[in-house]
C-alpha cells in the first residue's frame, strides 16, 4: 500500500516541501532508495547523499533543509526529529503489511482450565498456560511460550517463540518479549554455610528461596535471550517504556527506571537501582547494591562498582588501540609502582636541596643579626 506525502503529514504531522501528491510505499536508506520510497536524514554528515538520492521524498529537519545547495525536483517532509518520524512511519507500514493473526487457541496448546484467556488473544502451537494465569485482550503468544501459574499478561502484548515467564509475574500492556527470553527465573541467592579453612573446610551453599516476582510495566521491550530474575522477597521492577537489548542479565530485586535503555550483553547484579532516562552501553557490568541517578549514561564495556549519584556520562573502558601501542601502555602499567617510587624519591631529593645549604645559610644569617 502506498501513501501520498500529504496522507503521511496528516497522520504524523510535519510539513511537505515539494509535491504533496508524491506516493511512497516503503522506506529505504538515502543511498539505496528509489522513487517510490521514503528516506530520512538523521545525521548531517550524510547531507551530501540528500542531493544525490533517488528517493521519492526525504524526512529532514528545517536546519538541514536550509543547508542544502539545491532542492530542485526534490520532495521533503520537514519535521524536528526525522529519526523518530521515520520509526513511526515504518511501524505503520509494517503493521499494514503483516498478516493478521486469527484469534483463538491452537489445538496443540495446553491451557489450564482455571486460566483466563481473552477471546481476542492468539495462542500459538505448543503454548503452555498454567493455572490462574490471565492473558489479556489481543495478546499474542507464539509457539512454545510458557506462562507460569498466576502470571498476568497485559493487553496487546506479544511474546515471541520460546519465551518463558515463570509463576507470579506481571507484564503490562503492549509489552514485547523476543524469542528465548526468560522472565522470573530464580535470582542468584545462596547463603554460605562453611566451617574450617583450606582442605579442612566443610559445608555448602544454602539456596535462598526466591519468593518475589517480576513486575514489568507498559510499553517495555525485551530482547532475545535476555533474563530477568525474580526477586528474593519483593519484585524485580522494570518501569514503563524501558527498552532492553538481547542477552542482558538483570539480577534479582533490581529496579530499572522508566525510559531507560540497556544495550546487549550488559549484566546488572542484584538489588541495583537504575534511574529514569539512563543509557547503559553494551557489555557494561554493574555491581550489586548500587544506585544510578536519573539521566546517567554508562559507555560500552565499563564496569560500575559504586553508586553514580549525579547525571552525566561515565566511562571506565579502554578504547581499542594499535596492538604495539597497547603493549607499550601495558608495560608502563606493570611498572607504575616503580615509576611512582622514583618520582617520590626525586621529590624528596628536591625538597632536601631546598632545605639544605641555602636554608642553613639563611638561618645562620638570621642568628648573626640576633
Curated annotation (Swiss-Prot):
Q: Which residues form the active site?
A: 252 (proton acceptor)
Uppermost EC category: transferase
Q: Where is the composition biased (Low complexity)?
A: 358-370
Q: Recorded E.C. number(s)? A: 2.3.1.191
Concerning InterPro entries, the annotation shows: Hexapep, Hexapep_transf_CS, LpxD, Trimer_LpxA-like_sf, UDP_GlcNAc_AcTrfase_non-rep
Leader sequence range is none
Q: Which reaction does it catalyse?
A: a UDP-3-O-[(3R)-3-hydroxyacyl]-alpha-D-glucosamine + a (3R)-hydroxyacyl-[ACP] = a UDP-2-N,3-O-bis[(3R)-3-hydroxyacyl]-alpha-D-glucosamine + holo-[ACP] + H(+)
- Pathway membership, UniProt: Bacterial outer membrane biogenesis; LPS lipid A biosynthesis
State whether keyword Lipid biosynthesis applies: yes
Query: Which cellular component, as a GO term, is one annotated location?
Result: membrane
Q: Name one GO molecular function term.
A: N-acyltransferase activity
CDD domains to which the protein is assigned, alphabetical:
LbH_LpxD (cd03352)
Q: Which PROSITE patterns match?
A: HEXAPEP_TRANSFERASES
What are the record keywords, sorted?
Answer: Acyltransferase, Lipid A biosynthesis, Lipid biosynthesis, Lipid metabolism, Repeat, Transferase
Residue numbers spanned by region Disordered: 350-370
GO BP annotations listed: lipid A biosynthetic process
Q: Which domain of life is it from?
A: Bacteria
For whether the record's keyword set contains Lipid metabolism, the answer is: yes
Protein family membership: Belongs to the transferase hexapeptide repeat family. LpxD subfamily.
This chain's function reads: Catalyzes the N-acylation of UDP-3-O-acylglucosamine using 3-hydroxyacyl-ACP as the acyl donor. Is involved in the biosynthesis of lipid A, a phosphorylated glycolipid that anchors the lipopolysaccharide to the outer membrane of the cell.
Subunit-level organization: Homotrimer.
What name is this protein filed under? Answer: UDP-3-O-acylglucosamine N-acyltransferase
Question: Which species is this UniProt entry from?
Answer: Paraburkholderia xenovorans (strain LB400)
The gene it comes from is lpxD
Amino acid at each position: 500500500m502506498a501513501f501520498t506525502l500529504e496522507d503521511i503529514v496528516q497522520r504524523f504531522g510535519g510539513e511537505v516541501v515539494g509535491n504533496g501528491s508524491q506516493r511512497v510505499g516503503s522506506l529505504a536508506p538515502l543511498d539505496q532508495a528509489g522513487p517510490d520510497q521514503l528516506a530520512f536524514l538523521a545525521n548531517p554528515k550524510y547531507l551530501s547523499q540528500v542531493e544525490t538520492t533517488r528517493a521519492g521524498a526525504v524526512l529532514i529537519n528545517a536546519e538541514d533543509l536550509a543547508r542544502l545547495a539545491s532542492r530542485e525536483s526534490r520532495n521533503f517532509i520537514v519535521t524536528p526529529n526525522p529519526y523518530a518520524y521515520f520509526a513511526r512511519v515504518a511501524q505503520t507500514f509494517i503493521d499494514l503489511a503483516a498478516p493478521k493473526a486469527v484469534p483463538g487457541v491452537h489445538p496443540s496448546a495446553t491451557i489450564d482450565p482455571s486460566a483466563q484467556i481473552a477471546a481476542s488473544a492468539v495462542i500459538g502451537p505448543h503454548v503452555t498456560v498454567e493455572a490462574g494465569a490471565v492473558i489479556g485482550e489481543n495478546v499474542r503468544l507464539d509457539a512454545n511460550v510458557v506462562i507460569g501459574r498466576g502470571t498476568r499478561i497485559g493487553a496487546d502484548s506479544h511474546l515471541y517463540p520460546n519465551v518463558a515467564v515463570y509463576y507470579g509475574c506481571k507484564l503490562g500492556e503492549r509489552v514485547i518479549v523476543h524469542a528465548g527470553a526468560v522472565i522470573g527465573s530464580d535470582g542468584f541467592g545462596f547463603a554460605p554455610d562453611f566451617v574450617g579453612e583450606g582442605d579442612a573446610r566443610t559445608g555448602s551453599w544454602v539456596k535462598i528461596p526466591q519468593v518475589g516476582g517480576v513486575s514489568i510495566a507498559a510499553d517495555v521491550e525485551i530482547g532475545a535471550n535476555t533474563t530477568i530474575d525474580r526477586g528474593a522477597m519483593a519484585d524485580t521492577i522494570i518501569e514503563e517504556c524501558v527498552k532492553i537489548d538481547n542477552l542482558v542479565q538483570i539480577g534479582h530485586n533490581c529496579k530499572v527506571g522508566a525510559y531507560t535503555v540497556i544495550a546487549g550483553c550488559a549484566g546488572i547484579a542484584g538489588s541495583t537501582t537504575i534511574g529514569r532516562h539512563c543509557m547503559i552501553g553494551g557489555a557494561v557490568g554493574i555491581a550489586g547494591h548500587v544506585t544510578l541517578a536519573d539521566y546517567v549514561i554508562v559507555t560500552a564495556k565499563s564496569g560500575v562498582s559504586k553508586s553514580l549519584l549525579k547525571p552525566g556520562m561515565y566511562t571506565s573502558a579502554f578504547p581499542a588501540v594499535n596492538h604495539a601501542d597497547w603493549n607499550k601502555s601495558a608495560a608502563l602499567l606493570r611498572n607504575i609502582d616503580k615509576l611512582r617510587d622514583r618520582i617520590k624519591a626525586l621529590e624528596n631529593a628536591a625538597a632536601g636541596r631546598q632545605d639544605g645549604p641555602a636554608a642553613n645559610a639563611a638561618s645562620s644569617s638570621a642568628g648573626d643579626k640576633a
